[in-house]
Amino acid sequence: MTTRYIFVTGGVVSSLGKGIAAASLAAILEARGLNVTMMKLDPYINVDPGTMSPTQHGEVFVTEDGAETDLDLGHYERFIRTKMNRRNNFTTGRIYEEVLRKERRGDYLGATIQIIPHITNAIKEKVLAGGEGHDVAIVEIGGTVGDIESLPFLESIRQLSVELGRERSLFMHLTLVPFLGAAGEVKTKPTQHSVKELRSIGIAPDVLVCRGDRPVPANEKAKISLFCNVEERAVISLKDVDSIYKIPALLKAQGLDELVVKRFGITCPEADLHEWEQVIYQEANPTGEVTIGMVGKYIELPDAYKSVNEALKHAGLFNRVSVNIKYIDSQTVEAKGEEVLQGLDGILVPGGFGERGVEGKILAAKYARENNLPYFGICLGLQVALIEFARHVAGLEGAHSTEFNKETPHPVVGLITEWINEEGNVEQRHETSDLGGTMRLGAQLCHLSEGSKAAISYDGNTCVERHRHRYEVNNNYKDRLEKAGLVFSGLSSDRQLVEMIELPNHPWFVAGQFHPEFTSTPRDGQPLFVGFVAAATAYQKRDLG
């Protein structure tokens, strides 16, 4: 199969939405029957984002094969059917690590290791490998043109475009076309300078996607075309929208997909966007609204919970309600108590690491349990629910996780002592193990108890969800907790690890050790999120009634 490559760069400012624009183009091409994949090349030195602060970098998206990746891969999976893997995201740090490892082994036969050709060759090899087996591979380059960090990646894709030829490569550049209120017009100079910077390193964009808060007028498109040496039909206006799921239709209306397939000489049918039209219709026509309190510790940056936010919105589509997310700092719950949890239709406690704010999450679980308020716990959200139940129902005073209190008299949650590395080898984990890449990661099979809310939600007796954690329920306490009324409704494939818990006499008190948000999409939803929002809707109606 001959793979065509679309390289996506950004200029003027960061946070223009390269990932969303690239994913939207991928969605249109997929709707034309093409097999599309995507890649994100990140210029930072970290080997992967696994140990980066969520409040700086946003969430870590976990793929089926257990790679800890950039949150843009979450956008990719929400827009196209192709599942991402560890080949779809790599960093400068990963490239340098692999090149230096080869140098230490003597693979370069004593050569002087340089950015060109050794680093650029390594980048090109990964890009080509990631695109194998697909009709089109869309490659997003992180950062902004002009950044020092991005230069090796830009040089690599410049070389690739020469090697692949025009029939197999295309450059799409996102820029900002700001509107100046004082002048009463949009300004194209930032775009012109950004393209000039890109051309100075040997890359001439074939498509310009112009971001702004309003459409770019036709006369300004003509001006951009003239000064940036890009066909006028390839100057695409992409204004701000109230829903990112409208973007595929906006790009298609301007003929971007047709331009791409003609450039690549691909014969394929017109794009069928009826699934996206349905998503947009459901989003625009809710029959009600529910308020979900998300009790977390990274709420100053909502992108730290990007997939959770999106999964709640998707669940709203399937329940025909809009979901209003109220972000609640778990430390505020510790300081002010239950008053900050009033007026909610459901509580969701997402994942997290470290002791800060844990008691606030435990209090949130207690409030939901005692007030029959729908509760959904994810990863740490399961652990705090279990700790709360152990303390206040099972009579295990002082129960805790050894992550937060190594001297707890009742360690109901403890460290997983074995883990499998990327090569598939079993290694021992202990308190001083490296933080990076030493968790239980990726898709795992879970057996569900018959008749449980979990089994009803999934409409079956198994599910496969993605994990990212070091700590698990301590099996030594299972019998005592079960006798107190807790149901262990999900177990690992070998039935040795607890994957899900729930309370049978509660409208919806369900928690999973995994991260179901990573498998939610606007077209398909996710069973547990759909069930949770349905329970929140029912709670609201009962409360109002």
From Swiss-Prot:
SUPFAM superfamilies: Class I glutamine amidotransferase-like, P-loop containing nucleoside triphosphate hydrolases. The keyword Lipoprotein does not apply. One of its GO terms (biological process) is 'de novo' CTP biosynthetic process. The active site is at residues 379, 515, 517. Belongs to the CTP synthase family. Catalyzes the ATP-dependent amination of UTP to CTP with either L-glutamine or ammonia as the source of nitrogen. Regulates intracellular CTP levels through interactions with the four ribonucleotide triphosphates. Homotetramer. CTPSs have evolved a hybrid strategy for distinguishing between UTP and CTP. The overlapping regions of the product feedback inhibitory and substrate sites recognize a common feature in both compounds, the triphosphate moiety. To differentiate isosteric substrate and product pyrimidine rings, an additional pocket far from the expected kinase/ligase catalytic site, specifically recognizes the cytosine and ribose portions of the product inhibitor. This is CTP synthase. It comes from Shewanella sediminis (strain HAW-EB3).
